[in-house]
Amino acid sequence: QTALTIVSHKAANYSVVIPATLGALALGASRSDTDSLRMVLSPWGHAFQLRDDDLGIFGDPRVTGKSAGDDLREGKRTYLLALTWQEANASERAKLAHGLGNPELSENELEELRAIVKRRGRRRHEEVISTFEAEGFLALESSNFNADQRELLSEVAAMLIKRSK
């Protein structure tokens, strides 16, 4: 729950919702439109940060521009790792406890941690991302945005959620 609270403040608000709302206000959007925009973008902002956490462990460094596994070496406490910890057995938890936050992790140790995350947390993490994506689309469907605006916001969703960097 704490990890999701961090996601809410870090990404949903600061990285997605607030900048988009400010942009909409600057272009003269109504209060109703900015309220609708927040309802649509908040779950997509959550999904954006969760995708970022996945890319921090599994992303292609040639695409992301950062070393895959840095989040593990830095010991970032992400929702993906919280899910992994919940499902991990005692042996896997010991490996996670030893490896997370260890900047000296070898590539083999890093791969072992990735395998644990993939086995124990990644599937559920993807389900949560899909749930947030669907919540945003439900909000979009019930909004007063016109067809062109909905299409544009759907493209924004893809950029936020279906990204590889």
Predicted regions, residues:
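All-alpha prenyltransferase/terpene-synthase fold signal
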Residues: 1-165
